[in-house]
């Protein structure tokens, strides 16, 4: 595991005269620049690019501060930007995809933030999230310039090939590109933003539109490196460590991504899916704390919005009952031991309500009233449910985080006697992860299950959903290289799934639906 | 939950934006600068401010400069303003007391402006039922599409409650209780508060404003007007104590003729549902109750809306729902409302709907303008969308018009009448509009 | 807090105990065995059960044996019972529907019993205003001291609230809201529930019982009758579903003619205070609101009474008070209410009054009997205590009489009249008793 | 400190043929028996007696589970009892003092408890408290006899010389005598009740009438021993250890009790005095727990009524921050160290609100709503207040408990070089305790302060209030014996306080107001 992390590492910047331009920029900048000129009949000043990501293992655990194993993929979002110099600045957005209608809004002259209407589901809201986090970064970076004066007006042309609602995190790609662009537009060519800063400010961006996600997607999009996957950690601090796959004897380690083409809009289904899961794991952490007589966060840390999480519970439990008062620093061996202990506690204290906790059940275990629990836990964002399945969700988070640690050990083992060893062991972890996502977290869907079973019986060693689930993409560990069976898997999926489910699918769509992703470069800039 | 789909109209439409003429937009003070202006800003290419009129032209000029309204012209007279062809929509955002004397001549002069399509008037559309009836008739004759700012109907919480009720989540409505609070009308009056809102007849008081907005919202959510109502209006505080900003009494008392308490009870036309309302004037007390509570009890579940201040139309509310979804509930339009997959029918569903950082004051007006542009540019591609409609009534689509306002005025008129006559009135006919 | 001083009468008075004759005490079932009997047990030497009467003498005999009432005789006929000189006080604890036909002849026969001093009748003292007026007149002519079981007046929480209001802890009353719930009158009816409480005219319904007790309590706490009132009575559930003990529907529907919702609003004579009431029938929903909430807002503070079930007179309530004690408050009787030492006048006082293990069902009736014995044995050594008093009205001392019951009956009569006539009624004269 | 404690020690029983009858019984039984016969014209079966107590030091800390130093005094409550054999049994109470009216009530035939109306203030309620705890003890002792059959009917004649409302705990004396009598009446001569059982069942008795006090009064009344004071501990378990005062060279250690004659009725003033203080110290414990991120009681122990106390906070604080997970066992040295640390924490976290916490302040520190705090803390018993003085009350409890430990060390020191050393040191602790009760706990009154200052300037080394305060008695450490100055103190008090404050006071009343109390025998029985 190369130790360098992204503290001072700068987001890569290229220009037309750069000796060798990274492939994504070389391939895609010319066309977006042409489209910009035809839309605004002016040349853009620069193009900001940020990729989508696939997550090999560790789903729905980033918002509990547990580490994950994503890698940036060859699909990305580009924003061609021209900085304007108007007295009352405004931002005009045009998207190559007609589905996203053209938008224009003015920048408040007093330098205040552009308001985001959280009750509305629109692509421009995601632009405004990137704009907001960049604006607050600039207010701290250069208060004299941005405290009470508006940002620069912009003309923006957006084009991306990360399929939306596919679980490859098109929203994070878009937000990171926008944040990078807004900082570059307002600080000028002389300022070079660090990856760490871009990652830090974008991990919370989607909260402004009401999606309470963790930071995996943005971290992978910003810190992606060619031929490197990423070990992203959120605690003790936010860190993304690139690493190469182990060298096997006669196979390459490659991951096939297959899109179920079932679109799942994280925002609109949030009340019954994504945001509900965040409420469930937060509640589980607090019920565990109440049962074992520990306080998740002391008076200072806790607040009406910060209720602590399952990683906090693990820490205060070990402080109280094992006299280890420093929080877990991510060390693998002690992590495996503690997560195993957590799974025991979950069985002990939550297994008696497998049918789910009603609001009254939870209020009783937390020793507070119905109204109190509702006010404190259910008003952070809209939710709708019959019961809260604390047992299943907590069991998934701890077992999935345990699997990530085991996966990291595999990835950092110098060598394997037989390639089969790696594929078998890593594949097993992925299959367990899929089972847990399906049975415990209930975020799979029939199409995902179908694709996984087909892939597994056609050469994939490990198949699972990737991203939030409820549709979107799946990822498969398939031996690559000459005698690999990538083609075999693609063949099987095409015939047994795509042509069956989508009889009228075109070859191009099929081409796009199944891809072999090489870890790609993270966010970068191309200055004209 | 599909009401919250943003209109797909591009905020940079290929067609020209709606040109807006404001009566009452003043950069320095007032309601429009705090709400209409920021809303238009967010929809900057669907609406363009092209004309301002105010009795003193200097105010208009100063506002154009302050807000850098590059396409706006300040008009010296109401006539020149009303007849200018550079205006597609006129927005009236002045004191209710001057609505009548401005809108009537304005409609007359506007006959010289063939482009005028929309007339947007702030609630409470004139100070009396007669004035409201005359304005409504004049606008109808003039043939403009009218809009009234009963923006509570656009609140995401109200729309979600309406959805839950209409999809059978609480079964039949069994009873409703409302407790509200109208801030200014208590024992103390801030010295800077404008005198006219304390004098009866200016169209701004506890009944017309606080009760008006809330009861319109209730009818909209339950899709029902009232059949019988009874009201008791109180002025138990004929004199208020003047206080400074920090709340200290200045030892000076000022007369108040507007009411400081309203008792209202009635039955809804649909289902003879008992409704009990109590609106209190005065500083909202935080002691043991919230300042706005709407409880709707149904055979299959309960709905509750709560707000900190008593003004439902500008508060960031919290919606609580708990009930067993009646999936066998034959929907009004006959088809079966799909129960979300994964719910088993018998079990109780709980929903809490709150958007922590929603700015209701600007947001609701913003969404009202959005619904106007949706209509104007027919963004939802509704086949044969009529060029005009008389009233929103209880539809999800569209926006409230002067007819909706007129019906509300008739209800408020009967509130005062019921109090004066000491009798329960049958109001089931006030919702039939007659040209 | 001095209302809770226990009477100093010895429960073993040197004088003879009050000899009690019961109509309607049945060891097997009914209200008296659950409340009157345990109360008398605690005051075993101030009250002694000497006579029982019930249409079937076997019932009386069985009850005497079961309860081992060593001094009690079972009387075969109403006449023999009423005229027996072994009775000082007759307690009528039978269904309201038979009050009139039992009490009228009983009073007549009782003329042969020189010792009869007290007539204790359960609320609601007959099923109609006329019957109540006749019973009242007959008892007055007979010259007995009467008692009615409006025992909510004896609840420690109600007395504490009355004390706080009368000592100026909330200043002038500004507005009042009441939300209550009458258990049986909803969509479902327990199969074992007696039919007569669902048929209008039997003196037991949402208005007479649930509303009756609660509004009497409100008047008592605020020391004011009503001046104007308006009411709307609903029977939206003409047929109820029968359910077994475990709440499962038996698939059988039964008719209901009593109301299932009451809307009531009015103004108090003292201070023209707006009062808003909504009483709902049906299973108390625990979702988002308590089943009994009485909010009393004042110029100096707020008072709130909350209970789990809708019946104020038999619930173990919680009283919340918060306000700034007006120590400059001239008390009704002129002298200065002493502010507790150690309180500084300006600061807000908070009080929460709840007795965790108080049994309200037995306790309130027990304290009613105690007030009777306090009066009978003049335990508080009140100089020239009159031998009889017509009505308690709003005094702390004494107990409610048939005149207090009559005034409440007149209010309930005007509730039904207001609903039937659809008008707001002036009721300020109903509290003048006329012989 | 003699190690014997009252596990198997039996409540002393005497009869007319006993060789030497303890003085209180010898003196008082004959007269009460005569009065019983004249009231009921029958002879009683036995007389139960229990004394009042004075507390040398440790006020208002028993309900926080901290230890105290009381001793039984020569004033007591006697109940002459005749057991009846009626079909429907009832209990008749006659009191020698006419102020307490005669009472009679029936015993429910189904064996259920006699109801106590907590809203009423009457002497018979205290009898019913004793009856209740004895009844529940009997139901467990002999379920077959008492589960569903009534207790025996009784005729009772009560006479006591513990002045009520004087802080010498007349209510505890009465309750202990009654409980002892009821058990004896129902179990017959063959059963001999242990002191431990009598103490255990009576410590909670007053809660039934709505006074949430600790167990000091009952423990002292039951376990009193001639010439011995008592070190009463509540945790780890309830224990009363008698000890003798140290032998001084040429003075006796004696304590003068002076009654202010200001009657303070604990029940009627409870909402603003006694019960309010219980709410304040319970709230303080929970605010401290929230501030330092510890949980007072784990899910199982806590309940809607049991909110934990300041001793629980000390224990969980040391578990969390000093890795000592076993609760403090009362050891003096470690106790002194920990209580000193607690006083530091109180300064650190509560001193910023010396003017008192409003309900909103407390709700905020506990991170719950106004309504929640009101429901959980303010509905256990009626309370009325403007602010909750958490800082002052917590500081008093911890400092007073610290003083008790120092006092115990003094009392168990073998010898003193000079008598003056003992008197000076013990006196100083008493004076600090009075200052803390006055300034921090605000439970003194002008009369108490006056008596203390007079006594201190006339030969008393330590003067303080004793019992709940707000009136009642004071206790003074005065060197006794030939060259002591007991007379000097009595003189001064009589002239400078009693004759001034109560000009018409009679010699007999004066005699009774100032007494020198010798530690007396605890509860005992005299069988005829």
Swiss-Prot record, chains A, D:
pH dependence: Optimum pH is 8.0-9.0.
Catalytic residues (positions): 217 (proton acceptor)
EC number(s) on file: 2.7.1.6
Pathways involved: Carbohydrate metabolism; galactose metabolism
Gene Ontology MF annotations: ATP binding; galactokinase activity
Domain of life: Eukaryota
Residue sites binding ATP per the record: 165, 167, 169-170, 264-266
Binding site for alpha-D-galactose: 53, 59-60, 62, 213, 217, 274
Coiled-coil region: none
Catalytic reaction equation(s): alpha-D-galactose + ATP = alpha-D-galactose 1-phosphate + ADP + H(+)
GO biological process, one term: positive regulation of transcription by galactose
Keywords for this protein: ATP-binding, Carbohydrate metabolism, Galactose metabolism, Kinase, Nucleotide-binding, Phosphoprotein, Transferase
GO cellular component terms listed in the entry, alphabetical order: cytoplasm; cytosol; nucleus; transcription regulator complex
Induction summary: Expression is regulated by the GAL4 transcription factor.
Site (Transition state stabilizer): 53
Modified residues (Phosphoserine): 381
Primary role: Galactokinase is a key enzyme in the galactose metabolism where it catalyzes the conversion of alpha-D-galactose to galactose 1-phosphate. Can also induce the transcription of the yeast GAL genes in response to the organism being challenged with galactose as the sole source of carbon. It's striking amino acid sequence similarity to GAL3 might explain its GAL3-like induction activity.
Membership in a protein family: Belongs to the GHMP kinase family. GalK subfamily.
Name used for this protein in its record: Galactokinase
Native species: Saccharomyces cerevisiae (strain ATCC 204508 / S288c) (Baker's yeast)
Lineage: Eukaryota, Fungi, Dikarya, Ascomycota, Saccharomycotina
Gene label: GAL1
Curated annotation (Swiss-Prot), chains B, C:
Signal sequence extent: none
One MF annotation (Gene Ontology) recorded for this entry: kinase inhibitor activity
N-acetylmethionine carried by residues: 1
GO biological process, one term: positive regulation of transcription from RNA polymerase II promoter by galactose
Keywords, in A-Z order: Acetylation, Carbohydrate metabolism, DNA-binding, Galactose metabolism, Repressor, Transcription, Transcription regulation
Any one GO cellular component localisation term in the record: transcription regulator complex
Other remarks in the entry: Present with 784 molecules/cell in log phase SD medium.
Function description: This protein is a negative regulator for the gene expression of the lactose/galactose metabolic genes. It binds to GAL4 and so blocks transcriptional activation by it, in the absence of an inducing sugar.
Subunit structure: Monomer.
Annotated family: To K.lactis GAL80.
Protein name as catalogued: Galactose/lactose metabolism regulatory protein GAL80
Gene, per the UniProt record: GAL80
